[in-house]
Design a protein with these regions (language model features):
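Short, low-complexity N-terminal intrinsically disordered segments enriched in polar/charged residues
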Residues: 29-71
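Low-complexity, polybasic segments enriched for Lys interleaved with small residues
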Residues: 2-29, 33
Length: 197
């Protein structure tokens, strides 16, 4: 008799535990930790900076784009995504502000017939993640991009990842370094890239 009562009680306990387990499974997930003070405004400011950069490039305002860089800023597109630094190794692009200015002047030179008509581009930037924020406001940001290029009825697509090192200044962010890891960097193309992705 006592054994029957104990078995019944044990079954009820197991059933109650199963019901409780199901109830817990249906509960909403625990909310994420509250962001640090100012995190939303930093995220928004960084996103707006990257979107503005895309608009500047698509508008062919290349001097304005170059001006987004710090005096010692670098634009780097490695040939190999495993590369850790740009100095002294083969790269698709590895340019400081001086070389960027030379590139812009060459493309816009009136005798650069091979570059006419100029191409059109359309950038989409997303998945913007602040990887690191320093006490002075400098940030390291990862994002994804897709660029469509139209030139003489030929359409090309480039996609990949940006890593920006942004320096906070009184007039907003400036680019200390921009790394561009293109997913299709090793693909065969009819002609080379002339300006920045």
């Amino acid at each position: 008799m006592a054994k029957k009562i104990i078995r019944k009680a044990a079954k009820k306990l197991v059933a109650k535990k199963a019901v409780a387990k199901k109830a817990v499974a249906r509960m909403p997930a625990k909310p994420a930790a509250a962001p640090k003070a100012g995190a939303h405004s930093t995220q928004h400011a960084v996103e707006q900076f990257l979107y503005r950069q895309a608009e500047i490039l698509d508008g062919k305002h290349w001097q304005e784009y170059i001006d987004l860089f710090t005096a010692d800023g670098v634009y780097w597109m490695p040939a190999d995504p495993a590369d850790k630094h740009w100095d002294g190794i083969p790269s698709i692009f590895a340019e400081d502000k001086n070389l960027m200015t030379v590139r812009m002047k060459r493309v816009l030179h009136p005798d650069a017939w091979s570059q006419r008509p100029l191409w059109g581009t359309n950038h989409v930037v997303g998945n913007v993640n602040i990887e690191k924020e320093s006490a002075n406001g400098d940030v390291v940001v990862r994002s994804r991009f897709h660029m469509m290029e139209l030139r003489r009825d030929n359409v090309r697509h480039f996609a990949g990842r940006y890593v920006h090192q942004l320096k906070k200044t009184a007039s907003g962010y400036r680019i200390k370094a921009q790394r561009v890891d293109m997913t299709n960097a090793q693909a065969a193309f009819d002609y080379v890239l002339q300006v920045w992705v």
